[in-house]
Amino acid sequence: MRFMIQFSIPTQYGNEIVRSGKVEKIFKKLGEDLKPEAMYFYPADGLRSGSIFIQSNDPGLCVAVGERLWFGLHAQVKITPVMNGDDLGKGLSELGKAIENYS
């Protein structure tokens, strides 16, 4: 399954890790650990924020990813299952059966 992990770093802590040089180390380690399809960084609501896209079948994903971001960045974290076009197509192909069985 594919997931989008969104995070926002509190301003004060973000300033601290940028000044100390830790931010580069943390993001490099996240990339090594999570092996994401993509990582994007941007300002959102006045905070340093980002989105990480990963594939995982691990039921412990929320804990594993959340703890890295909470401990490493003091971040607010949101984890959302997402689909690409192929995933959506597979789901839609099953839609007829679901409608037939549950309507």
Locate the predicted segments by residue:
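Conserved, structured core segments of small domains
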Residues: 1-103
